[in-house]
UniProtKB/Swiss-Prot annotation:
It is found in: Cytoplasm, Nucleoid. One of its GO terms (molecular function) is calcium ion binding. This is Chromosome partition protein MukF. The lineage of its organism: Bacteria, Pseudomonadati, Pseudomonadota, Gammaproteobacteria, Enterobacterales. One of its GO terms (cellular component) is nucleoid. Residues 208-236 are annotated as: Leucine-zipper. Belongs to the MukF family.
Length: 440
């Protein structure tokens, strides 16, 4: 998990002092990718200057650049990448002029982004989650066993810091790559619809379904392992509560819980956003069909029916059940006959008109908790209030009580990232999910 020990001014001064900069036009980036590809084929991971020049020649030919100055331009490109810390150059006195080059971590990171991280793999994600689950279980067992400071550093903190956290970051990177792929798919669909939307419908449907399936597969894999991961993190957290000198472990566990929550939450949110985009595309296609002036679809259907016996086809259709409105539409017309006439004093009195009065009463009653610094259990308080009102008013009263309660303070348990338990608040199945408010 990424942690910065320096402040922002220190990092800025450090970058300025070392003159860090990255400039990779498309030809230089292509050259770097070519170097990484050729480097991956070598067992020693080393390349000579002649091999780099050969790689540059391939890139130069692909960009249709002149070959007369290939040596000078290749030398400039190599020196520029060494200056930008994308390549490391090693020379020796015995072999002067015959340098050896190796990719730096920065160069590997950039090329990995463009080459090795482009495809989503459920198997890779499953293996990562399996490794994380094993590491967390061993760390939780070690935490419950207890021991000296060396034991906590070696068997709990180190696996969490250097294995679990890094895999979480890798999964987070996979999600961000999926975000980028979604945007690319959207651009592809937009281009297809702009060119020839009639011919592009099948292609759009394929792109939509493939992306939706990949997102769902990713989320299902995460959710299947999420509960076990959280359970082991909670075991470690419980074990550290009795020790005052393990703040570094507790802080790391909290960071991991937050990271896992963000990963799972964003996975579901990205699915919801994609579903909305899917509906938007289908709505556009339906609108285009409705506005089809040339009746292309009608002509195609007529032709398909006429040539059915020569070229048989199958028709698949969906027919959803109709939603029936069970309200009595004539109720409004005979409202007076059913309810009779209200007394003049009550004719205009509705629940929303006494809402402010009720809210003031509840606010005054709940203020006692803040004055006495007593924890406020929303489940018990709401249930007590609802018992005083008819069932028809339960929703409105519960909303008022909760609105007034959350203004008094917050629950420290909310900052743990763990969901609260559902508590029944009436005898009709209504429930509320909220931590005890203990900080005013």
């Amino acid at each position: 998990m990424s942690e910065f020990s320096q402040t922002v001014p220190e990092l800025v001064a450090w970058a300025r002092k070392n003159d860090f900069s990255i400039s990779l036009p498309v030809d230089r980036l292509s050259f770097l990718l070519a170097v990484a590809t050729l480097n991956g084929e070598r067992l020693d991971g080393e390349m000579s200057e002649g091999e780099l020049v050969d790689a540059f020649r391939h890139v130069s030919d692909a960009f249709e650049q002149t070959s007369e100055t290939i040596g000078v331009r290749a030398n400039n490109a190599i020196n520029d990448m060494v200056r930008q810390r994308l390549l490391n150059r090693f020379t020796s006195e015995q072999a002067e002029g015959n340098a050896i080059y190796r990719l730096t971590p920065l160069g590997i990171g950039i090329t990995d982004y463009y080459i090795r991280q482009r495809e989503f793999s459920t198997l890779r994600l499953s293996m990562q989650l399996s490794i994380v689950a094993g590491e967390l279980k061993r760390a939780a067992d070690a935490a419950e066993e207890g021991g000296d400071e060396f034991h906590w550093h070696r068997n709990v903190y180190a696996p969490l810091k250097y294995s679990v956290a890094e895999i979480f970051d890798s999964i987070d990177l996979t999600q961000r790559l999926m975000d980028e792929q979604q945007q690319q798919v959207k651009d592809d669909i937009a281009q297809l619809l702009n060119k020839d939307w009639r011919a592009a419908i099948s292609s759009c449907e394929l792109l939509l379904s493939e992306t939706s399936g990949t997102l769902r597969e990713l989320q299902d894999t995460l959710e299947a392992a999420g509960d076990k991961l959280q359970a082991n993190l909670l075991r470690i957290q419980d074990a550290t509560m009795i020790h005052d000198d393990l703040h570094f472990v507790d802080r790391l566990v909290f960071d991991l819980q937050s990271k896992l929550d963000r990963i799972i939450s964003w996975g579901q949110q990205s699915i919801d956003l994609w579903i909305g985009y899917d509906r938007h595309v289908h709505k556009f296609i339906r609108t285009a069909i409705d506005m089809d002036k040339n009746r292309v679809f009608a002509q195609r259907l007529r032709q398909s029916v006429q040539t059915y016996f020569d070229e048989p086809w199958a028709l698949t259709y969906a027919n959803a059940d109709r939603l029936l409105d069970m309200r009595d539409e004539e109720m409004v017309l005979r409202d007076e006959e059913v309810t009779g006439e209200l007394p003049e004093d009550l004719e205009y009195e509705e629940f929303n008109e006494i809402r402010e009065q009720l809210a003031a009463i509840i606010e005054e009653q709940l203020a006692v908790y803040k004055t006495r610094q007593v924890p406020l259990d929303l489940g018990l308080v709401v249930r007590e209030y609802l018992s005083q009102y008819p069932r028809a008013r339960h929703f409105d009263v519960a909303r008022i009580v909760i609105d007034q309660a959350v203004r008094l303070g917050v629950a420290q348990a909310d900052f743990t990232g763990l969901p609260a338990k559902w508590q029944p608040i009436n005898d009709y199945g209504a429930k509320v999910q909220a931590h005890v408010i203990d900080k005013y």
